[in-house]
Amino acid sequence: MPQTHEMSLNGTQYLKYELKDLESRAHDAKTPSTNEFYDDVESHGTEELVEAKLSFLNRIAAGLSAETKGIEPITEDEKTDDSILNAASMWFSANMVLPAYAIGALGPMVFDLNFGQSVFVIIFFNLLGLVSVAFFSVFGAELGLRQMILSRYLVGNIAARIFSFINFIACIGWGIVNTVASSQVLNMVNPGHQCPLWAGCIVIIGATVIVTFFGYGVIHAYEKWAWVPNFAVFLVIIARLARSKKFVLGEWTSGPTTAGNVLSFGSTVYGFAAGWTTYAADYTVYMPRKTNKYKIFFSLVVGLATPLYFTMILGAAVAMAAIGDPAWKTYYDENSIGGLTFAVLVPNSVHGFGQFCCVLLSLSTIANNVPNMYTIALSVQATWEPLAKVPRVIWTLLGNAAALGIAIPACYYFSTFMNYFMDSIGYYLAIYIAIACSEHFIYRRSFSAYNVDDWDSWERLPIGIAGTAALIVGAFGVALGMCQTYWVGEISRLIGDYGGDIGFELGLSWAFIVYNIARPFELKYFGR
């Protein structure tokens, strides 16, 4: 096992690099980061004042050992995170959480699949989704580019900015959905003296702020151990489930309706596993270029697959038990997965200790929120150059504040709408993967084809005409293939009695076809 790199980005060495980076921005007018932060200072007095204030904020952040680096490429001198364990544990903790457990329960509860069918879907579609996360994590170490900056090479400059905006919406949306779910679990604990929903939101977001403010180093240090209490709670759930003797395998079914349900559940599982794709490189950019790429890839595969399989299969097992028990089913119908977990752990079970376990499980969402609220800042900066002038720490704080401001009313008025909205926005991942993989494997073929110095050059980066066309056409494919409560596409409704969700499949395939038709023309007439 590689030696663990203990918080190398948070001590004296990290602070030295941060201060050095800030000084170079202030004095070297030839660097890309200087152009970003100090453009037209001499001719614009107001801008000079704003830039000075932003520089001051960055210095405060650096003084607190917080990461001040934004979307600028990470230099080789700054690549000090040589721990493969850091890369793997990042996603291990982020997926050993309540939301992944909740996804698994959907197989029996929503899609009428038995335990065996649910497990098959969980194994197959998770594997399809997580491979892209592991693959693009390799790019972070090799090129030192954030995922949305890397996207300028992979999908084109214009399309990358569209994806950056969508990614920003996804980050804040999933942060809201996760926070609402956790606050609802906290609200069930200690009947008669419950934690108010708004207070639960403050607890979850507040803890997320503390971790994400300090950036890469503290995030990896937190995620390295955040899985431990969550895993312990899941073991307690397994023990209580076994003692209840309520688990059943269920009956095997077949036919078009079952096929449609398998596809729909598979779409949900795939979306959760692949959801980290547009974040991937952000969490390996400080790894040295010499790091073995196969070790990164396969450690990420294990770090992703293990918690996803474990939590989702457990969720499916608990759901199967609830199907045969009216009391547990009522808890689920009224309070979703949080209610079902409460039913397993508290009434006629371990009582006070069970409530304590519910609290721990609700706090597990912090580990899932942290990547959202860190990447949100980088996505905003990558959308438009003026936004990159605002320090990362400010965007992180603003993103968390926005999530809190929306999550509190969502708890009371529109939590269902938020879930529907996020189910819809997740389809962009398949389109992104189709375009990005096409560009790398068909047109670039090796890392040597990426000139990192071009990261902010409109003249040298791919324009993004092909990428934008593929995104638009892929979106039409998604609309025809998606199967949600509020929308069933014309093609998806042909599968079974309730439709089958093939939005990811159509979006990916249509985007792939259009991109590879348009990209050769873009290269021929524009040369990039």
UniProtKB/Swiss-Prot annotation:
Report the membrane topology from the UniProt record: Multi-pass membrane protein
Provide a Gene Ontology MF annotation, just one: nucleobase transmembrane transporter activity
Outline which residue ranges sit on the Extracellular face: 112-118, 183-198, 243-260, 317-340, 415-416, 482-493
Pfam families named in the record:
Transp_cyt_pur
Going by the UniProt record, its keywords in alphabetical order are: Membrane, Phosphoprotein, Transmembrane, Transmembrane helix, Transport
Q: Return one Gene Ontology term, BP aspect.
A: purine-containing compound transmembrane transport
Any one GO CC term of the record: plasma membrane
Q: InterPro entries recorded for this chain? A: NCS1, Pur-cyt_permease, Pur-cyt_permease_Fcy2/21/22
Cytoplasmic face of the membrane:
1-90, 140-161, 220-221, 282-295, 362-393, 438-460, 515-528
Which of the residues bear the PTM Phosphothreonine? T46
Compartments, record wording: Membrane
Task: Report whether DNA-binding shows up as a keyword of the record.
Answer: no
Where does the record place the modification Phosphoserine?
Answer: S43
- State which residue ranges cross the membrane: 91-111, 119-139, 162-182, 199-219, 222-242, 261-281, 296-316, 341-361, 394-414, 417-437, 461-481, 494-514
Q: What does this protein do?
A: Probable purine-cytosine permease.
Entry similarity comment? Belongs to the purine-cytosine permease (2.A.39) family.
**What is the protein name for this chain?**
Purine-cytosine permease FCY21
High-level lineage: Eukaryota, Fungi, Dikarya, Ascomycota, Saccharomycotina
